[in-house]
A protein has these predicted regions:
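Helix-loop-helix hairpin linking two adjacent transmembrane segments in secondary transporters
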Residues: 132, 138-188
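C-terminal transmembrane helical hairpin of 12-TM major facilitator-type secondary transporters
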Residues: 272-319
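Conserved MFS/SLC helix-loop-helix module at the cytosolic interface between two early adjacent transmembrane helices
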Residues: 62-100
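Residue-level signature of mid-helix packing/kink "hotspots" within the transmembrane helices
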Residues: 29, 56-65, 148, 255-263, ...
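Helix-to-loop junctions at the C-terminal end of transmembrane segments
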Residues: 63-75, 261-273, 356-357
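Helix-breaking motifs and short loop linkers at transmembrane-helix boundaries and internal kinks
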Residues: 43, 75, 96-101, 130, ...
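Cytoplasmic helix-loop-helix junction between adjacent transmembrane helices
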Residues: 106-141
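Extracytoplasmic gate region of multi-pass secondary transporters
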Residues: 31-32, 209-252, 256-259
Length: 395
C-alpha cells in the first residue's frame, strides 16, 4: 500500500501535497471566519457580504476550468505556481483595500487559489496510488484539519483585541507564500498534460433522469453547505446567541464533525447499502439544521452543529457514487454535473445576505432550512429511481 513512499520524489510529492491541502483548508475557512471582522471594520452590509462570499465560490468554479486549460499549455507546475500567487495577493487586498472593489477582488481570488489547489492536489495524489480510496480520504482529512484549525487560531488571536484579525491576514499572507514555495519544491513528473479523446460519449446524458437527480441533490447540498459555512459565525455573533470566541469555536466543531463523518461514512459504505446511508444522512441534515436554528442555548446549538456536520459529511461523495455509471458512459457528464451543482454554492450566500438585509440574519439563515428539505426530497427521489431501475452504485 505504501510502496510509492520508497521513491524519494514520490515521497516528497505525497508530503508536500498533504501539507498544501491542509493550508487550503485554512484558506477555505478563513472566508467565513473573517467575515464578521471585515463587516465591522469596513462597514459593509449583509447584502454585500453575501456577494463576496458568493464570489469566493465563483473563483473556485472558474479555477476548475481555467486551471485545467492552462496546465495543458504551460504545464502543471507553472500553472499551479501562477494560480497560487493569488493566495497571498488576496489577503494583501483585504489588508490594504479600503473600498468594496478590492474586497470583492480579494474574495474572488481566494476562490481561484482554493480551486486550483484542489484540482492539482487531488490529481497528483491520485496518481501516486490510482484507485486507492485511502490516499484521497487522507488528503481530504488534511483539508479538514486546516479548516478547523483556522477558527481556533483566530479565536486565540482576537481574544483580547478584536482588531487583531488583521494580524491573521498577515499570517495568511506568509502561509500563502509558504504554500507557493512548497509547490515550487515539488518534484512533478509528466508535467505536460496529455490531451484526452475529445467528445467521447457525447451529450446523451441529458436524456438520463439520473443526471438531473444527482445534479439536483448536489445543487441543493452545496447551497446548504456554502450558506452555513459562509454565514454561521456571523449568525451566532449578530443574533447574540454566542460570543465572538464561541462562534469561532463552533466553526471548528463543525469541521471536526465533518472529518469524523467522512471517516465513518467511508467505513459504513462497505457494510450498509449506500441508498440507505444517503437517506439517513439526508434526514440527519434536516433534523439537525432545524434543531440548530431553533436553539437558543449553547448545549442545543452544539448538538445541532455536531449533528449537522456529521450528517452532511458523506452526502457529496455518496451522491457522486450514484452517478458513476453515467460518468463512465458519458465522460462529459461530470463537467456538467459539477458546473450546475456548483451554482448552488454561488447563489445561496447572496440569497442569505439579501434576506438578512431586509429581515435580519435569523430569517436569512432560516432560508437554508427550505434548501435542506428540498435536498432531502431530491435524495429520496434519487434513491427511489435507482432502486426501480436497479442502478449499480459504483464504489
Amino acid at each position: 500500500m505504501f510502496d510509492f513512499l520508497k521513491d524519494t520524489n514520490k515521497r516528497k510529492l505525497f508530503i508536500f501535497n498533504y501539507c498544501v491541502f491542509m493550508i487550503n483548508g485554512m484558506l477555505a475557512l478563513s472566508v467565513g471566519s473573517l467575515l464578521p471582522f471585515i463587516r465591522s471594520a469596513r462597514g459593509i452590509d449583509y447584502g454585500f457580504a453575501g456577494l463576496i462570499v458568493s464570489l469566493h465560490s465563483v473563483g473556485n468554479l472558474v479555477a476548475c476550468f481555467v486551471a485545467g486549460a492552462l496546465r495543458a499549455v504551460i504545464g502543471k507546475k507553472k500553472s499551479i505556481l501562477f494560480f497560487n500567487l493569488f493566495f497571498a495577493l488576496s489577503y494583501l487586498f483585504i489588508i490594504f483595500g479600503k473600498n468594496p472593489f478590492w474586497l470583492a477582488a480579494a474574495f474572488f481570488l481566494t476562490g481561484v487559489a482554493r480551486g486550483a489547489s484542489s484540482n492539482f492536489c487531488n490529481t497528483e495524489i491520485n496518481s501516486l496510488a490510482p484507485g486507492k480510496a485511502w490516499i484521497i480520504n487522507g488528503l481530504h482529512a488534511m483539508f479538514s484539519v486546516g479548516a478547523f484549525a483556522f477558527p481556533i487560531f483566530l479565536t486565540i488571536l482576537t481574544a483580547n483585541n478584536a482588531d487583531n484579525w488583521i494580524i491573521a491576514c498577515y499570517v495568511m499572507v506568509g502561509i500563502g507564500i509558504l504554500s507557493w514555495i512548497l509547490y515550487l519544491l515539488m518534484p512533478i513528473e509528466n508535467d505536460k498534460v496529455e490531451k484526452t479523446e475529445k467528445g467521447k460519449g457525447g451529450l446523451g446524458f441529458f436524456a438520463e433522469p439520473i443526471f438531473y437527480l444527482c445534479t439536483g441533490t448536489l445543487f441543493f447540498y452545496l447551497c446548504a453547505e456554502q450558506g452555513v459555512i459562509g454565514w454561521l459565525i456571523t449568525y451566532f455573533e449578530d443574533t447574540g446567541l454566542l460570543s465572538a470566541s464561541m462562534s469561532q469555536l463552533m466553526a471548528s466543531v463543525l469541521w471536526i464533525m465533518i472529518l469524523a463523518g467522512r471517516l465513518l461514512t467511508a467505513t459504513l459504505s462497505t457494510r450498509i447499502k449506500k441508498e440507505n446511508l444517503l437517506v439517513i444522512m439526508g434526514l440527519g441534515i434536516v433534523f439537525f439544521y432545524f434543531l440548530l436554528i431553533n436553539s437558543t442555548t449553547t448545549f442545543w446549538i452544539l448538538a445541532g452543529i455536531m449533528g449537522f456536520g456529521f450528517s452532511m459529511a458523506g452526502i457529496y461523495p455518496t451522491t457522486v457514487s450514484f452517478s458513476g455509471g453515467i460518468i463512465e458512459k458519458f465522460p462529459m457528464a461530470w463537467s456538467y454535473i459539477l458546473t450546475i451543482a456548483s451554482l448552488g454554492s454561488i447563489i445561496m450566500p447572496s440569497i442569505i445576505g439579501k434576506i438578512a438585509d431586509k429581515k435580519g440574519i435569523g430569517p436569512g439563515m432560516a432560508s437554508v432550512a427550505v434548501v435542506v428539505l428540498i435536498d432531502l426530497v431530491s435524495i429520496i427521489g434519487l434513491v427511489i429511481y435507482c432502486k426501480k431501475k436497479g442502478e449499480k452504485v459504483s464504489i
